[in-house]
Amino acid sequence: NRPPQEFIHVAFERMRIAYRIDGLERLDPAERYLFVANHPFGGLDGMMIADALIERFGDARVVVNDLLMHVEPLQPIWLPVNKHGRQTAAYARRYDEAFAGDLPILTFPAGLCSRRRGGVVSDTPWRLNFIKRAHASGRKIVPLYVEGRLSDFFYRIARLRERLGIKLNVEMLWLPDEMFRQGGSRFRIVAGDPIAPDGLRGTLRQQADTVRGEVYRLKEKLPCTK
């Protein structure tokens, strides 16, 4: 069994995927961070950021859909969340222990990959759990912006599903194919300044929206080259 980072490197080499991330070098490795990012890809973005966090901090954890536990080489870094039923006691304990620990944690507050609305690709409304966890754990929040989008086909399927009133995210079935479509690409990611949760104002929803706004403002700070 390969270590998670080695598995990621082999996968990216075979897919000819590369990325550049700016801003992590400004962060104190001794701090406890909760990284929050937009979610354009539904898997690939998590692997890129996880690789960068392991490189910078030595290890990391990523909050993911529990279906990704089937990717066995990455199980050590996953914090699985059951989005289709009750969370198991083992998963809940793993989640709590990670937030109580010191390793950096990455989460995608949208909970699913971005969708297209009015011609603009952006996250669906963010869930509030990351704000609650940041306050409870005393972790500083680091916003991350990931450049990228999926195919027009994926967004059309998602829109059709919504128009038909189907609640199940059937477009998820195309995510593996969408990931392989990204082969040969280079991506840009940028990290913002840490945000102390105690410095956020308003309701939990307002606080989450503030952080989301910071994430999307980082688009203006993407490095000029990939």
Task: Write out the residue ranges for each language-model feature.
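Short, flexible loop segments at the rims of nucleotide/cofactor-binding pockets, characterized by
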Residues: 10-16, 81-87, 119-120
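Structural motif
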Residues: 34-36, 80, 106-108
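Short beta-strand segments
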Residues: 37, 63-64, 108, 145
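Short gly/ser/thr-rich secondary-structure transition/capping motifs
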Residues: 15-21, 87-89, 171-173
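Non-catalytic C-terminal accessory region of glycerolipid acyltransferases
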Residues: 91-226
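Membrane-anchoring hydrophobic helices of lipid-metabolizing enzymes
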Residues: 1-39, 44-48, 57, 75, ...
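"Short basic amphipathic alpha-helical interaction patches in structured regions
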Residues: 47-53, 121
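Conserved nucleotide-cofactor-binding alpha/beta core module
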Residues: 54, 58-100
